[in-house]
Amino acid sequence: MYTFILPTSSEIELREMTGAEEELLTNQKLIRSGDAVNQVLKNCIIRIGENEDVSLTNVLDMLSGDRLFTLVKLRQISLGDEVDLELTCPNTACRAKNRATVNLDDLPVTPYGEEREFVFTLPASGSKVRFVYLDGHKEKRLAQMQEHSISSAMMIRILDIDGNTPSKKALNEMSMRDRSALRQEMLRVDAGIDTTIEFDCDSCGSHIRTKLEAEPSFLFPGVRL
């Protein structure tokens, strides 16, 4: 068993992934519903703090930064620290294959503070927005939405705007200045492990940016999915 300290400062104990978890992570129905990762986390988490009977609800209660941190650590203990990437250049005139190796121990981790709710005053309208961190419940709701949009991703974290329940209409009518400022504030207070990978194409110099967990080789090295 392996023990780590989560970004929320709780201790977590994990076991390695097995073939059962590999099957879950390749089940397209579970992937679309958002249940694949949740079930893998439930299977492989032995303990969170003093809780040795970790349920699916406990997994969904985890903040997103803790969840991604746990997934990265599961990858490390199951498959090793290094991830070999093959990324296609986004430049349509190039499309060269670029290879890179990432050491998961090098990914920066930002701990969570004590606050769980935040109030932000929008610069243009002066409205006050109360919002929270993303957690597993909200991630699952986002995965099940038929339409993925910037408004949906923002709204799912908002508790109220000037005391009123947020709506898609309110988000769509919000000025771009206010929306941009709110997104930046959400990013500023977010914590957890940063899985952003950035480098320049070897052939043309175009910038390549991706999230490590979005790449097949993160969980399936050497396998073409």
How should these model regions be labeled?
Residues 1-225:
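Short, surface-exposed, charged amphipathic helix/loop patches that serve as local interaction elements
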